[in-house]
Every structure is written in C-alpha cells, then in structure tokens.
A protein has these predicted regions:
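Long, internal low-complexity/basic segments
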Residues: 19, 69, 107-142
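Intrinsically disordered, low-complexity polar regions and short flexible loop motifs
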Residues: 100
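C-terminal cap/loop subdomain of S1 sulfatases and analogous C-terminal strand-loop tails that border
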Residues: 2-6, 12, 17-20, 24-93, ...
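Short, solvent-exposed loop/turn segments at secondary-structure boundaries
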Residues: 8-11, 107-109
C-alpha cells in the first residue's frame, strides 16, 4: 500500500489478465513470473515509473473456427482491428479515438502509414503468442 499513491486517476489500459503478472511484481515476485505468461507486467506504470504507451491486444475468435474473427490493438489514441473469414482478411478498421470517440468513422483507407504500423505491431504480438492468425496479416492492403 505504501508504494501506490492513493486516489490516483489514470487512463492506463489494463486487461484483467494483466493483473497476474502486475500483482506478482508489485509484491516483489517479478522473477517468479513464468516466461510462458503472455500478458503484461504493468507494475511500473501503476507505480508511475513508466510513461511508455501501453498497447493492448484485442481478440474476437469463433471457437469452432479460429481462422474467422477479429484481432486488433488499442492504444491511447487509436483502435485498429482486422477481420478474417476462413483465413482471408476481409475488413480493416482504424479509428482515431481522440477525434472520433464513438468510433463511427473508419479512417483505414485514409491512413495507410498507421495501418502498416499497427499491422506490424499486431503481427509481432500474434507471432509472440503463437496465434496462427498472424499468417493472414500479410494480405492486409488497406
């Protein structure tokens, strides 16, 4: 309790799964976090010792067909996602949440540089987590 300032307002994007490594680290057990853990240790962010942007992966998978569904990323400013049907990318969406907080206007077609950047980040994450969806991302063109 003495490490974390009370009544701290923060816009840190943290997923439920990130609690496991983050809490272990906060309790002094960083070295005991298994290498197989695929979520993030955000303890440095919680303690205010890191200003690095957190990028959270997003998944929507049909459990009977892993080649169909969404994968994406969310940053502090953007939401990016791609959809595949049977292993073929058929939709790419990109929203600027600072200008379009309700995510009504897909700007993927107007922002090819950002699409490539987020596509690269997403593919790296999917390869890291052994998600076969990573192999479909080579077909992203928008």
């Amino acid at each position: 309790p003495a490490k974390i300032k009370p009544r701290k307002d923060d816009h840190l994007m943290i997923a439920f799964a990130d609690l496991y490594p983050s809490l272990l680290s906060l309790m002094g057990f960083r070295k005991e976090i298994p290498e197989t853990v695929q979520t993030f240790d955000l303890s440095r962010h919680i303690l205010g010792k890191s200003k690095k942007e957190v990028v959270q992966p997003y998944y929507y998978v049909q459990f009977d067909n892993h080649a169909t569904g969404y994968r994406g990323l969310r940053t502090s400013t953007h939401t990016f996602a791609v959809h595949a049907t049977n292993g073929k990318i058929d939709e790419t969406v990109l929203y600027d949440r600072t200008k379009d907080p309700y995510q009504m206007y897909n700007i993927a077609g107007q922002s090819p540089r950002l699409v490539r950047q987020f596509n690269k980040q997403l593919k790296a994450w999917l390869l890291h987590t052994n998600d076969s969806f990573a192999h479909y991302l080579a077909t992203v063109t928008k």
